[in-house]
């Protein structure tokens, strides 16, 4: 978690932390969740009335339990996101080129070791992305 703070995070919640205990109920306007899984219910609890939950991944698990009351009684919006408008990627690259944000690479693997990369990825002990390097 120190590594995440070093690159600019103001507040860090661990993978196994209770998000409701860490943030408090109805304390957040928007949740961007790239993980999914068991933390889904807690993510909805921390959203304020009219809040938005955006999902763009499910590496923590694609199936979740939803109490519909936590959704409709707070007038929440659930948004799936897999594609960006054309200028978004160019803007992201610009931020990286200017050093305003930097990708966090946990580890690199030669492409022929993709099975090792997948195995290590599933252990969930890393911070950042894995990069596969194709042969020259």
Model-derived segments and spans:
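Glycine- and other small-residue-rich loops at beta-strand/loop junctions that grip anionic moieties
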Residues: 13, 29-33, 56-57, 81, ...
């Amino acid at each position: 978690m120190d590594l995440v703070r070093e690159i600019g995070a103001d507040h860090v919640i661990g993978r196994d932390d209770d998000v409701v205990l860490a943030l408090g109920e109805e304390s957040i306007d928007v949740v961007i969740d790239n993980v999914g899984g068991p933390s889904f219910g807690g993510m909805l609890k921390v959203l304020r009335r009219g809040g938005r939950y955006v999902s763009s991944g499910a590496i923590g698990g694609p199936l979740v339990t939803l109490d519909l009351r936590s959704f409709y009684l707070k007038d929440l919006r659930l948004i799936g996101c897999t594609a960006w408008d054309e200028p978004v990627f160019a803007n992201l690259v610009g931020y990286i080129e200017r050093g305003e944000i930097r990708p966090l690479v946990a580890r690199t693997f030669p492409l022929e070791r993709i099975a090792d990369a997948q195995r290590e990825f599933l252990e969930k002990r890393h911070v950042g992305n894995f990069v596969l390097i194709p042969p020259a």
